[in-house]
A protein has these predicted regions:
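Conserved small/polar residues in nucleotide/adenosyl-binding loops
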Residues: 1-5, 335-339
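Long, charge-rich intrinsically disordered scaffolds of nucleic-acid metabolism proteins
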Residues: 272, 283-337
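Duplex nucleic acid-engaging cores and interfaces of nucleic-acid transaction enzymes
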Residues: 3-186, 190-295, 302, 306
């Protein structure tokens, strides 16, 4: 140690900001640590090893806080097995400050590898120092950089996969065959605020709208009134198909419709459950306001649900793709013009 200190004195310089021997020695250690960190072969090996044998874990910032990320409050999975949707969920939970996410590397194996590469010959005077420098280089420089690279790579792959799924699902949704030549009753289901109805003719023109209350909280009287109202619209406008949105109160509405149709078998009216994702977004949009200036959002939504079965493509192109709800975390992704 005395010899090292003597040699280090030559590097002490007030002008260069090296005030004493300790600073000179620490500076030398930092230089070695940076050189180790800059070795591309080391980084490649460590990244591959971490990807193969490492894991990603997450913990709650506050375990008492309720959120949609509770399954990630105490979570760990190997890097190589982590599914894309989990990566996106972890990223979002971290961004919203519910969880802390980290990459757990096989640190002992990594340090053993680095020591073998850096320390060419065992020397009782230098080996302990070099081991400390290697550990510092990994923990302070290499490790954090590798963690960022791995998480960035996983995120890129997860987003690419999510966009592919989104595009495929959206194409299938948009290319559904239209049901032409039918007068359709659009049914936007709900509980407390009532179910909004809209009848559109074969060209998509809205003929009538109303609200019925057959779902909870309700009474037999309200259910009967709802059935009578719908039967009256079927009779008046020649409705042959009822398009029911698949949102809240869908099943309850479906049961009411099934019971009602049993009462009028001669009308041969059918019903279909329709994906209503994005209908509420559209109904509050500027485009919907211009298209239906005298309707409220519920009436616009019901009209949209009816039109979706008549011509899915023409109706769905009015909605921001991120609001259609056919992918994984699509609201978190940045889309290029051809993503869908």
């Amino acid at each position: 140690m005395y010899k090292r200190q003597e040699e280090a004195k030559a590097y002490v310089s007030e002008e260069k900001g090296v005030k004493n021997v300790a600073e000179a020695l620490n500076g030398a250690k930092d230089i070695i640590a940076e050189r180790i960190s800059d070795e591309a072969d080391y980084r490649i090996y460590i990244r591959n090893l971490t990807t193969k044998n490492g894991s990603i874990s997450s913990t709650a910032k506050n375990a008492e806080t309720q959120s949609v990320y509770e399954m990630y409050y105490e979570f760990e999975e190997p890097v190589r097995k982590l599914a894309g949707h989990r990566i996106l969920a972890l990223n979002r939970g971290e961004k919203e400050k519910f969880i802390t996410v980290k990459v757990n590397a096989p640190e002992e194996d990594i340090l053993r590898y680095l020591n073998k590469r850096v320390i060419k010959k065992d020397n009782p005077n230098t080996t302990p120092i070099l081991k400390a420098v290697v550990e510092d280089s990994y923990k302070r420089l290499i490790g954090p950089a590798i963690e960022r690279e791995i998480r960035s790579d996983l995120t890129d792959k997860a987003e690419d996969g999510a966009i592919h799924v989104f595009g495929k699902n959206l194409e299938q949704l948009l290319m559904q065959p239209p049901i032409a030549g039918k007068v359709v009753l659009g049914w936007d289901p709900a509980f407390r605020t009532g179910c909004k109805l809209a009848v559109v003719d074969a060209t998509g023109k809205v003929l009538d709208t109303t609200v019925v209350y057959p779902t909870a909280p309700t009474t037999e009287k309200k259910i009967r009134a709802a059935k009578d109202t719908v039967e009256g619209m079927i009779e008046k406008y020649g409705v042959s198909l009822i398009s029911v949105g698949n949102g809240t109160a869908c099943r309850e509405s479906e049961q009411v419709i099934v019971d009602m149709l049993k009462e009028i078998p001669e009308k041969k009216v059918q019903y279909v459950i329709t994906n209503e994702a994005g209908a509420s977004v559209y109904s509050a949009s500027k485009l919907a306001t211009e298209e239906f200036p005298n309707f409220d959002v519920g009436q616009r939504s019901a009209a949209s649900i009816a039109r979706r079965v008549q011509d899915p493509l023409a109706e769905l192109v009015k909605i921001d793709p991120k609001s259609i709800g056919v992918g994984q975390y699509q609201h978190c992704l940045l889309y290029t013009s051809d993503a869908a």
